[in-house]
Amino acid sequence: NNAPDAHYWLAKSYLAKEDYQNAKKTFITFQQENPIHHKFANSLLELSIVHAELGEKNQAVTLLQSMIKKFPNHNSSIKARKLLRFIISR
C-alpha cells in the first residue's frame, strides 16, 4: 500500500510550496494513520517547522521535545535539536 507514502510526500510538497495550512492538515493525517511508518519521525520534525512558520511556537516546541524524547537516535533528532534551540532563542 503506497497511500501512506503518498500522504507523506504530499505534505512535504505543501511545505515546499509554503502552503502551511495544507501541510499541517496532511502531516497530521499522515501521523494519525501511520504511527509506525518509517517516515513518522521525519514528519514530526516537518510538522514542527510548519507550526513555527505559522507562528505556533508552543506547538512547535512541544512537538520537537516529544520527537527528540521518543526518537533520540533518529537522524532527524539532530535537526530537531537545532531547530528547537533556534525557536526558543527567538
Regions flagged by a language model, labelled:
Residues N1-R90:
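Acidic, polar-rich low-complexity tracts and alpha-helical solenoid repeat scaffolds
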